[in-house]
Amino acid sequence: MRMFLLLLPLVLLLSAVETQGISVVDLSALREIKNSLTDITSSSLNAFFTSWDFTAPDPCSSFAGITCSLFIPKRVTTLTLGTGLSDSPGLAGILSPAISNLSELTQLVLFTGIVTGPIPDQIGTLKKLSVISLTNNRLTGSIPTSIFTLPNLHTLDLSHNQLTGTIPGSISELSSLKVVVLGSNKISGEIPILPTELLHLDLSNNELSGMLPRKNRMPLTLRYLSVSGNRLWGPLSVLESLSELVYLDLSMNRFSGTIPSSLFRSTLSSMYLQRNNLTGRVPQPPLTSPAATVYGPGSTVDLSHNSLTGELTNTLAGVETLFLNNNRFTGAVPKDYVESVYSGNTRTLYLQHNYIAEFPVKEGLPLPDSVALCLTYNCMVPPVPLGFMACPVSAGGQISRPVNQCSAFNTSMA
Ligand SMILES: *[C@@H]1O[C@H](CO)[C@@H](O)[C@H](O)[C@H]1NC(C)=O
Ligand SMILES: *[C@@H]1O[C@H](CO)[C@@H](O)[C@H](O)[C@H]1NC(C)=O
Ligand SMILES: *[C@@H]1O[C@H](CO)[C@@H](O)[C@H](O)[C@H]1NC(C)=O
């Protein structure tokens, strides 16, 4: 026994020297990975692979971008390719299938660069992976379906690449999956049923079509949902019960019908619904909890370029950045909006291109410098001189709407 204890350090030392402490399989995988990628920069100062010297005694402590398990043979547990520094152009080349030999890997990260080719199918054999983040490169092909079988996957970020194909239905089985970011690719097909405890879903700027998953199939835990810039359609009633949402972006799709009143609440502090085909009114603040619609600093609501009608209610007064332009709102704007603009709480209020008849501002009150207000092309002569308004170029030069378009909404007309 004593003999064994004395020998043990020696054995460990010998195997460490022989294998450089690191598993030989992992070491040869790292070699393959390096051989298939290159630094775009030629300056060794901000190059990533400078430290990857395969004659070094302990790659686990000297290679940039890897961490290893403690015990010998050490296994690579996280791999981060690229420096991630803003002055580094990143890597070029392809992702070697040899990554799949790093069987203890829990995190795989590739920073911004111009890496091309597909995501190796074999990645799906790395059962311990919990984070896959391969963003801002030029990866092509479809997302390997094997990724959607990884039992420990928590975060999948493949945004800003050129990925095609569809999102497989097996994604719904991944109960550990919390964060899915596939934005800015060319992914098509429909949005499948999602994992029940998903927190963050970004599918923006793809080629998705069809409707959102049915109401009872939406993850109630969702806090962040963006599907902006796709070809999605159908009603928004499926979102009614998502009470945890703080960020919602459905802009630039073909959604129609009314906006569920449950989405008008201050905890949903960023809501982008612009450029759809939404109809109906902005609801009244709920009588039971009017405080639920007291929006704070940083809040943004964009309902522009829809077909919303009726008179504005107090619900959105106080939103810091508020776009209501290019709808069919009528009547007088409630005083609370005007007060919020003149107190500087609302910093942007776009109301142009509606059928609004009155913006009840007190004569001579100076507009705070920080405020961008646009009231043109409504059924009134704006009470604020054109030179004091901050209208976007797209608002056009006309101060008011032609009278013949307004007669139907002119309540003061006999
Ligand atoms: C994984 O490692 C084995 C043994 O070193 C090797 O034969 C095989 O080619 C490797 N796999 C890949 C995908 O590189
Ligand atoms: C928008 O909605 C209206 C009325 O529901 C419908 O007639 C029209 O076709 C829709 N437009 C688009 C682009 O979906
Ligand atoms: C609304 O009707 C009144 C009374 O006929 C008229 O004086 C006013 O110019 C009209 N306003 C607009 C914007 O058409």
Describe each PLM feature range.
Residues 2-65:
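Surface-exposed cap/linker segments adjacent to membranes
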Residues 30, 79, 223, 242-247, ...:
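Membrane-proximal ectodomain caps of single-pass cell-surface receptors
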Residues 38-94, 384-388, 403, 410-411:
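LRR flanking "cap" motifs
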Residues 92-100, 119-121, 140-145, 164-169, ...:
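The feature encodes a structural signal of leucine-rich repeats
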Residues 97-215:
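A generic tandem-repeat structural signature
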Residues 101, 125, 135, 149, ...:
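C-terminal capping segment of individual leucine-rich repeats
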Residues 113, 134-137, 158-161, 182-185, ...:
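Consensus "Asn ladder" position of solenoid repeat domains
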